[in-house]
Amino acid sequence: MSDKYASLSPYVYCADNPIKLVDPNGEQVHPAGEEEYSMILNTLPVEDRAYVQLDDNGNINRELMNSHNSESGNYDRLCQLVNDDMMYDVILDDEKYIYKDKNGDLSFQTATYQKPNFYTDLFKYEPGEYALSTGEGGNLGLTLYPGTTNYFNSPDDNVKIYINKNLSREGRAENFSHEGYGHAFLYCITGHDSSLSGHIPLKTNGDGNIKLKLLIETAQSETVSNLKR
């Protein structure tokens, strides 16, 4: 599995990624604003953040990211998204996530939010749980892919990574790790196959998409550690 999905290994460096996973004419990761940019930085080790900067178009600078070797799995996944031949729009929204349905009609999901149910130990984390360590809940994010094959699709030709703007600093970073380094990253490394990039609910609870589960757990866990530093 680690041969096909190189970044499932904890020791993969962005500058040394296999050519098959990097497009020299790749698109970009585009944070919609400064808050989105800060959210992405907060998922990374402090020492790596200087290599994640925006270009004149507001996109993450691909050449700068590629110039740096990091042991961070989150850095590597972000780097591969930046090198993919797809545009990834990162959007904070506190009202609705706009999507296109199977008929091509636009609609939206409401960005609901529940405050934390505990107020101490913000970095409490139990591996294997998708719930945020902050205790925040609701409809906290959504990743949408181009096309009309799913019930919820991107409204345009870009991948949309929506994160609930009501989330705390920590909650935003954790949930971007779920959506960006889980769903969007799996979409990237499977050749843009949205059928492989979503949750597979099991009758006994849990997620049947083992690759996605592993990606989300490791990304969220690293983000929690990076935020504590």
Give the positions of each predicted feature.
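Short turn/helix-capping motifs enriched in Asx and small/polar residues
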Residues: 1-52
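Catalytic glutamate of the conserved HExxH
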Residues: 17, 175, 179-184, 188
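Sec-dependent signal peptide cleavage junction
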Residues: 34-39, 59-61, 226-229
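Stable alpha-helical elements in mature extracytoplasmic
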Residues: 36-40, 172, 176-177
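Residue-level detector of alpha-helical secondary structure
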Residues: 41, 79-83, 92, 216, ...
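Conserved small-residue motifs centered on glycine
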Residues: 45-114, 124
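Active-site scaffold of zinc-dependent metalloenzymes
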Residues: 106-174, 186-187
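Post-HEXXH active-site segment of zinc metalloproteases
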Residues: 170-174, 186-228
